[in-house]
Amino acid sequence: MIYSGGLATYCADAQATADLLRTHDVVVVAGNVEERLSVGVKHCGCGFNEGSACDVLASSRYDHAGHTIYKETNCWMGSLPHIATFTMSRAHLAVAHGGVTQTNRSIFPATPDEDLRRELQLSGTDGVIAEHSEIPYSRQVDSQLWHNAGAISMPANDRTLRLWYTVVTPSSDSIYIKIQALDFNWRGAVAKIRAAGLSLACADALESGLWPRDKIISSDDQAQPGRPLTESALKWSTRGVMPKPKSQRIAAP
């Protein structure tokens, strides 16, 4: 199991989330939040416009995490890799939080092929799995894969009270990539947010399934906010992939 970063700034259970991931030996990739908490930076660096509703929301969550996460956990965050790699069905895959070289880059479903091709080339892999844009989707560019796993901690702006994750299953000549929805106790999460005094925009997003309107998102992707997403799957052929040495888990940058 791999978690693609951002564990500290959603809802009110930052320390408990970190403890859960570590207890179960989940591979965690550093997002912009982990990078900054580990060195004591005062802003999350999520990439939102200064003073926007999303910036205020993110700052509220980040400040709460900064005050509740243990020092030892911050040190652990500083040891996390920026990219984790593994080999499956001969394909060499990378897991990043946002972009390959820019941790807080949001890559949305309507991102041009040229941009994805550049990111994939920089990765040096056959495919990349990321998360920062929080919308689950799969794109094939030439024979390569760009996949956004969705967020396990925030609805996907589709007006449903669900979270998203991805299951990848290997076969001899392909990888089956399934985007799955997760129902969760949103009422309990909202109650904790309110009790902790976090920005109400965070609670509103969980209750409505919609993000603040000023969230940075491409015009094409923003055209249909609130349209319910459906679970989907892609069978990605790895027949043309050149075999590579088996990758090990990365435990440090």
Predicted region positions:
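Acidic, His/Gly-rich catalytic cores of divalent-metal-dependent hydrolytic chemistry
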Residues: 140-253
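Conserved hydrophobic/aromatic beta-strand scaffold that supports enzyme active sites
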Residues: 83-85, 95, 138, 165-167
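Core catalytic region of metal-dependent phosphoesterases/phosphodiesterases
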Residues: 1-65
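Anionic-ligand binding region
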Residues: 113-152
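Active-site-proximal segments of metal-dependent phosphoesterases and phosphodiesterases across multiple
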Residues: 48-56, 89-123
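Active-site environment of divalent metal-dependent phosphoester hydrolases
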Residues: 9-12, 33-39, 127-140, 154-157
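Metallo-beta-lactamase
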Residues: 57-92
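Active-site neighborhood of phospho(di)ester-bond hydrolases with catalytic His/Asp-centered motifs
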Residues: 1-6, 27-32, 96, 127-132, ...
